[in-house]
Structure formats: structure tokens, C-alpha cells
UniProtKB/Swiss-Prot annotation:
Cofactor names: [4Fe-4S] cluster
Residues binding [4Fe-4S] cluster 1, per UniProt: 13, 48, 82
GO biological-process terms attached to the record: tRNA modification
Native source organism of the sequence: Clostridium perfringens (strain SM101 / Type A)
Domain MTTase N-terminal: 4-119
One of the Pfam families matching this protein, by short name: UPF0004
Cellular localisation: Cytoplasm
Protein name: Ribosomal protein uS12 methylthiotransferase RimO
EC numbers, comma separated: 2.8.4.4
CDD domains documented for this protein: Radical_SAM
Length: 445
């Protein structure tokens, strides 16, 4: 009997991508995988439920995939992820198109759920409460470029920012054991991975729950010992949780990219307090200065929320002044999304959508100008570039200054560049977010 074909649509963040990779790793031995939903007998939609825009995309995708039940081969539609965890039975009632629903802690049940359905048991699985990080993440089927992989070091969050639903969806903060992280990283390196990107809802507090103190610096130190790993990149660092040992490890460890993602969300103390952020403007600026002083050529990325309830014109202008003065290398900006079940959703002084959008556009324009200025200062510099693809005219890759998907890229001219390899590139042209360079002779490895 021919194997059923399974297709996957993964939505949302890179943490969701890891969940999708775990599920694909679990089903690949039992079923044939396909990227074409027209061919799939079983379609899995791993949803995002973080903000309204993401929820709508997830719902639309489920409905789009449900059409393949009548037009093509789909016999089973499975919804998983944050949306299913957040809404549970309510989602099943609203969307009868879903045959099976699994929450963010139910991925180990994926094969059992599929087999039960095939055998005629049509009971719809419900989302369960969070548990420890117990799934063997080594079973993952990596979906990124061969040389790059995300490595989750913790799950859940204890910060409880007033705008965020994640603690209710993903549960309390739980660190993975260091031995488990290193074991998975070794397997990734054996399969050709050169860049590890460490992720969690909060990477900087790694270890505080299981070791009694923050141990991210130790994770970096141990991962750097693995043969084949060239870059280690850290995302989702809470600025108030950055500590001296971590800064020192970044500065002395050649394999750790001089790059940090610091989602500060705002700079006005008024807004930070209403957001429930455990820091202040003064502390944030102090931490940025410490990083720049102690880590040469460090690149700092952040994300900002505009239009938060009570954000005054003065608060917004303070944010603009901060961006102009501090000149962070990479900035992502989002309009506040009013999410039911969060304290911010019932706050007074909600901001009109038109005002939110105007503020978002103003920040984006400001950062665009700064980004072009920052990039022009890179002209003539040489970078080690990890080549990811060839578009027919240029090789395309990234330097240590660029995380995949969220930052720019480097368009590379010249002979010798190879996919999934590093090569030395000299920058010849600066664009708003991207760079153009030429391969330095005999530099690829």
C-alpha cells in the first residue's frame, strides 16, 4: 500500500518553525512528505496566535487548505500551534473544517492522532496544558538552509508583559538541560550546520529555573567547542537580563557573532511601565553602552511597539529621539495589537488605528534613512559571508551582522562562491537594507 503523503504549512516565528520541524521529523518515517498541498493526503497547519494579524492569517490558511478536501486529495486537516492552544474548543466549534487539533504541547501525539483517524477513530484531540520541554528535538527535520539551524534552549515565559498572551499559550519558563542542547547541536553540526541561532521566548534568562542562575554564557562556551560550528547567534535577549559574564563571553568567543537581538519595545518610561517591562530608559541605554564598549563592532537589533495604550505624542517623540541618537543597526516596528485576555486590552486611552499606522510608518521611514547611512559606512570593508543561494546573477548570503529573514543580505559577485560555504567579500555598494560585494580571491571555505 502506498504511503499517505503529508504536507505542512508553518506560520509565525522561528520558534514555531522548530515545532514544525519536530512534527515533520516524527512523521517522515511513517509517511511521504510533500511541499505541494495538491498532492497531500494529510495537511498540517501549524498556526500562530500571537496578534490579530497572525490569527487572521492562520484562519485564512486553514480555510485555504480545507479546499483541498474537495478539489484534490486531502482526507485529513490537522491544526496545531498557538492558535489552537489559545482558543481550544472554541476554534473547533467555529471551524468544523479541522479534523484534528493539537496544542503546542501535543506534538508527540501527531503520529498517534493520524493513525487513529486512519483507523476510523474520528475523535478530535484537544489542546493540553504546558509541560516540560520533553520532546526529542533531535528528531527534527531541518527546513532552513543546510548551513543554518535554529536551536531552542528554553520554552515559555515568566515576564508577563501586559500586551502579551504568550505566557498563557506557552506556559511558564522552562530551560532545556545544557547536555540536551549540546547533544542536539552536535547532531546538527554532523549534518552540515555551520550557524546555530539560539532562540527562546527569553534567551537571556536561560538556566535560572534549573540551575538557580543565568547560564547563557555557559551555553555559548560549550557550543563553541563543537567541530563544524562557525557562528553562534543569539536572538530574543531581554535587555534587563543581560549580565556581565554574558557580555564577556560574547566579546572573547570567536564563534559567537557580535550580534544581539534586544526587543526593547519602547523607550519612554511611561510606556515601559504600562507595558509591564521590568526596565527603564536609563537602564536600556546603559546596557547598550556597555555592549558597545565591551564588544567590538557589535550589531544590535531591536523591535518596537507603537500605539500602545496611553502612548502620548511626547512618548512617541521620545522614541524617535532615541532612534536618532542611539542609532541601532536593525529595527523592526509593529503597531500595538489589542489582544483579549491581556491587561493592556482593557486599559484606558486606547490609540486609534490610523494613529498607530502613521506612527509605524514614521518610525520605519526614520530607520530606513539611518540604515542607509549605517550601510554606507561599510563600503570597502571585508566580511566573511555565508552563501545561501544563487539567483542567476548574484550569490546571496549574510555576514555576522545579519540574521536570516529579519535582516538584509549581501549580493555577491565573482567566482568561487559556493552555497552553504563561507567566503570573504569586499563591500562595493550600499543599499537601504542590503549590501553588494565582490568575492575576494580564493577566500571561500
Amino acid at each position: 500500500m502506498a504511503k499517505y503523503k503529508v504536507g505542512m504549512v508553518s506560520l509565525g516565528c522561528d520558534k514555531n518553525r522548530v515545532d514544525s520541524e519536530i512534527m515533520l521529523g516524527m512523521v517522515q518515517n511513517e509517511y511521504e512528505l510533500t511541499n505541494n498541498p495538491k498532492e497531500a493526503d494529510i495537511i498540517i497547519v501549524n498556526t500562530c496566535g500571537f496578534i490579530e494579524k497572525a490569527k487572521q492569517e492562520s484562519i485564512n490558511t486553514i480555510l485555504d487548505m480545507a479546499k483541498y478536501k474537495t478539489s484534490h486529495n486531502c482526507k485529513l486537516l490537522i491544526a496545531t500551534g498557538c492558535l489552537t492552544q489559545r482558543y481550544g474548543d472554541e476554534l473547533l466549534e467555529l471551524m468544523p473544517e479541522i479534523d484534528i487539533m493539537l496544542g503546542v504541547n501535543d506534538y508527540a501525539k501527531i503520529n498517534e492522532a493520524i493513525m487513529n483517524f486512519i483507523n476510523g477513530n474520528n475523535e478530535k484531540v484537544k489542546a493540553t496544558n504546558y509541560s516540560d520541554v520533553s520532546i526529542n528535538e533531535g528528531l527534527r527535520l531541518i527546513t532552513t538552509d543546510k548551513a543554518t539551524a535554529y536551536l531552542r534552549i528554553a520554552e515559555g515565559c515568566d515576564n508577563f508583559c501586559t500586551y502579551c498572551i504568550i505566557p498563557k499559550i506557552r506556559g511558564k519558563f522552562r530551560s532545556r538541560a545544557l547536555e540536551s542542547i549540546v547533544e542536539e547541536a552536535k547532531k546538527l553540526a554532523e549534518n552540515g550546520v555551520k550557524e546555530l541561532i539560539l532562540i527562546a521566548q527569553d534567551t537571556t534568562n536561560y538556566g535560572i529555573d534549573i540551575y538557580g542562575e543565568k547560564k547563557l554564557h555557559l551555553v555559548l562556551r560549550e557550543l563553541a567547542k563543537i567541530e563544524g560550528i562557525e557562528w553562534i547567534r543569539v536572538l530574543y535577549c531581554y535587555p534587563e537580563a543581560i549580565y556581565d559574564e554574558l557580555i564577556k563571553e560574547i566579546s572573547v568567543n570567536d564563534k559567537v557573532c557580535n550580534y544581539l537581538d534586544l526587543p526593547i519595545q519602547h523607550i519612554s518610561n511611561n510606556v515601559l511601565k504600562r507595558m509591564g517591562r521590568k526596565t527603564t530608559k536609563e537602564e536600556i541605554i546603559g546596557k547598550i553602552n556597555d555592549l558597545r564598549k565591551n564588544v567590538p563592532n557589535i550589531v544590535l537589533r531591536t523591535s518596537l511597539i507603537v500605539g500602545f495604550p496611553g502612548e502620548s505624542c511626547e512618548d512617541f517623540n521620545e522614541l524617535k529621539d532615541f532612534i536618532k541618537t542611539i542609532k541601532l543597526d536593525k529595527v523592526g516596528v509593529f503597531t500595538y495589537s489589542r489582544e483579549e485576555g491581556t491587561p493592556a486590552a482593557i486599559m484606558e486611552d486606547q490609540i486609534d488605528e490610523e494613529v498607530k499606522k502613521a506612527r509605524e510608518e514614521e518610525i520605519m521611514l526614520l530607520q530606513k534613512e539611518l540604515s542607509e547611512e549605517i550601510n554606507k559606512n561599510k563600503l570597502g570593508r571585508e566580511y566573511d559571508v555565508l552563501i545561501e543561494k544563487f539567483n542567476g546573477e548574484y550569490y546571496i548570503g549574510r555576514s555576522y551582522e545579519m540574521a536570516p529573514d529579519i535582516d538584509g543580505c549581501i549580493y555577491v559577485k565573482g567566482n568561487g562562491a559556493k552555497k552553504d560555504q563561507f567566503c570573504k567579500v569586499k563591500i562595493e555598494k550600499a543599499l537601504e537594507y542590503d549590501l553588494v560585494g565582490v568575492v575576494c580571491n580564493e577566500s571561500c571555505k
